[in-house]
């Protein structure tokens, strides 16, 4: 990822960099998930964070293995009240639990897939909010890589080792591939057939979810050359009932 510390351009879907200003401690702490927990004595870190710095030759088993905590306070402005609010973690190594304002909203077992969480019902628009993350990279054979770290010839560290985003969008939206829980069906799914030197058939599925009132949506797909010129386009109209979803198909 190239998130750095920059905010993306505003649009229907706004992604705000959430990397800066986390509190961190490399140990387990009782009660750290609570909204009013005092974390003022913890270190301040910016993400991504791999728990520690290790020498160049650091194979599996040399690194710290165990729980660590991250906490961050944030405010939401009134313009977001009509939107869905999403926390998107690109990667938390090991077992993780995530709380917002003291409510546990996600438990995850994998360090390699993103965690895309709808927190709309848990956030406050008038007072500061708190997100707390417990990340545990201890040995656990129930998820990848599936063996003790001492048996590995590499170190996968721990912590929130990839970027984090606060995302807002409308209640009618293109779903996220992992959050949709549809095999090869969430988000935008593209595959190719009949490939030759002269042509190729491009198939695109777009998963659109409507959590608002009944409405008409238009799904537009453009195939662009490297210079940005459109060489093919498709526009389809769909009637979406209240609180319903549709998968669009284009060739």
For each feature predicted by the language model, list its residue ranges.
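Beta-strand-rich binding/interaction modules
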Residues: 100, 198-239
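Predominantly extracellular/luminal regions of secreted and cell-surface proteins
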Residues: 21-49
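Aromatic sugar-binding surface patches on proteins
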Residues: 113-115, 243-251
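Residue-level detector of high-confidence beta-strand sites
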Residues: 27, 47, 107, 233-235
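Accessory beta-strand-rich segments of carbohydrate-active enzymes
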Residues: 4, 8, 28, 65-181, ...
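Short, solvent-exposed loop/linker segments at the N-terminal edge
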Residues: 190-200
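Solvent-exposed, conformationally flexible loop/turn segments
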Residues: 126-128, 199, 241-247
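N-terminal pre-domain segments of enzymes
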Residues: 1-31
């Amino acid at each position: 990822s190239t998130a750095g510390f920059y905010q993306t351009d505003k649009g229907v879907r706004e992604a705000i960099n959430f990397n800066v200003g986390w509190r961190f401690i490399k140990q387990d702490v009782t009660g750290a998930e609570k909204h009013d927990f005092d974390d003022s004595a913890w270190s301040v870190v910016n993400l991504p964070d791999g728990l520690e710095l290790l020498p160049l030759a650091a194979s599996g088993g040399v690194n710290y293995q165990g729980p660590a905590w991250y906490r961050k306070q944030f405010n939401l402005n009134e313009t977001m009240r009509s939107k869905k609010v999403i926390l998107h973690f690109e990667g938390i190594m090991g077992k993780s639990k995530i709380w917002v304002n003291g409510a546990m909203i996600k438990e995850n077992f994998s360090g390699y897939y993103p965690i895309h969480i709808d927190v709309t019902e848990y956030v406050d628009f008038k007072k500061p909010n708190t997100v707390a993350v417990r990340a545990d990279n201890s040995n656990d054979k129930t998820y990848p890589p599936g063996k003790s770290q001492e048996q590995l010839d590499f170190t996968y560290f721990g912590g929130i080792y990839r970027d984090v985003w606060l995302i807002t969008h409308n209640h009618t939206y293109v779903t996220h591939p992992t959050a949709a829980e549809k095999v090869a069906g969430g988000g935008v799914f593209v595959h190719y057939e009949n490939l030759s030197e002269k042509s190729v058939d491009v198939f695109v599925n777009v998963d659109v979810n409507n959590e608002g009132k009944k409405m008409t949506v238009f799904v537009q797909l453009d195939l662009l050359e490297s210079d940005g010129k459109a060489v093919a386009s498709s526009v389809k109209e769909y009637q979406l009932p209240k609180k319903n979803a549709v998968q669009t198909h284009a060739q």
